[in-house]
């Protein structure tokens, strides 16, 4: 990690510690710096660690505790913005994904659809492209992103069950190395999506997670809209198509065909 980003990460973690958040802040060496070197001049860092267990995704209590913790740290995670560390523009990313899906459609049409995956893709891609375009037209993402950057809002970037440690009544959060200045709904979406995939997209648990987050950090109308767009965008569909195109196009597993159909 670049020293400047590491320094900013430590600044963020120290700010969070001051607000009684349990986070894996770095430890400075005798010279007061974050990066040390061993006898072979290999750089390393040392961090606070916690004796706890990972969030158990089979436990509703753990899930909701993790969601409330995310909402709590989001209220604190702000620094003066550095555009070098801004997250990717979601609208630009969706436009690029749409272009890639169109490219894959052209490729299959040109060579001819032979297997089940290719035939199903040609049957369904137009609907997904139209859905994706409609999502982009209705979103207020541009203004929400601008507001988030102006306020210096920061995303964890890798908030999942592996980086949430349950310590009895308390919760620690680790591995902030993927942090960025961004719309914080990105964290909430990624965590919820991972959980919902394990729960067969159970709306009941989805509502509980949203309520838990909103009870700690109330969501604005733009943030609700942004979450809706993220969940409605055919991200999984794009990933399957992109995997097909970038890997061996002649070999498509039955599992991927089934995923495309569902």
Region roles according to the model:
Residues 1-83:
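ATP-binding pocket architecture of kinase catalytic cores
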Residues 3-4, 55, 84-154, 259:
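ATP-dependent phospho-/nucleotidyl transfer catalytic cores
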Residues 22, 219-223:
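Helix N-cap / loop-to-helix initiation motif
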Residues 26, 136-186:
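Active-site acidic catalytic loop and adjacent metal/ATP-binding pocket
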Residues 44-57, 79, 103-111, 233-251:
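A glycine-centered beta->alpha junction motif in the catalytic cores
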Residues 185-218, 231-250:
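Active-site activation/catalytic loop segments of kinase-like enzymes and analogous catalytic loops
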Residues 250-262:
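Charge-rich, low-complexity terminal tails
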């Amino acid at each position: 990690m670049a020293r400047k980003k590491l320094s900013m990460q430590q600044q963020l973690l120290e700010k969070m510690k001051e607000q009684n958040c349990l986070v894996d802040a770095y430890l400075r060496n005798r010279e007061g710096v974050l990066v040390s070197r061993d006898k072979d001049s290999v750089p390393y860092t040392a961090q606070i660690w916690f004796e706890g267990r990972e969030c158990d995704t089979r436990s509703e209590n753990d899930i909701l505790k993790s969601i409330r913790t995310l909402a709590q740290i989001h209220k604190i995670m702000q620094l003066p913005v550095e555009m070098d560390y801004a997250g990717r523009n979601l609208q630009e990313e969706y436009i690029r994904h749409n272009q890639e899906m169109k490219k894959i459609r052209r490729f299959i049409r040109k060579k001819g659809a032979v297997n089940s995956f290719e035939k199903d893709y040609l049957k369904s891609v137009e609907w997904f492209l139209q859905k994706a375009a409609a999502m982009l037209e209705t979103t207020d993402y541009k203004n929400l992103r601008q507001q988030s950057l102006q306020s210096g809002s920061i995303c964890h970037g890798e908030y999942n069950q592996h980086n949430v440690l349950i310590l009895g009544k308390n919760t620690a959060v680790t591995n902030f190395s993927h942090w960025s200045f961004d719309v914080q709904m990105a964290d909430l979406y990624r965590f919820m999506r991972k959980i919902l995939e394990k729960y067969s997209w159970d709306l009941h648990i989805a509502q509980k997670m949203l309520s838990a987050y909103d009870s700690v950090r109330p969501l604005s109308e733009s943030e609700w809209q942004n979450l809706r767009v993220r969940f409605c965008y055919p991200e999984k569909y794009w990933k399957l198509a992109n995997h097909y195109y970038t890997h061996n196009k002649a070999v498509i597993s039955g599992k991927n065909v089934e995923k495309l159909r569902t």
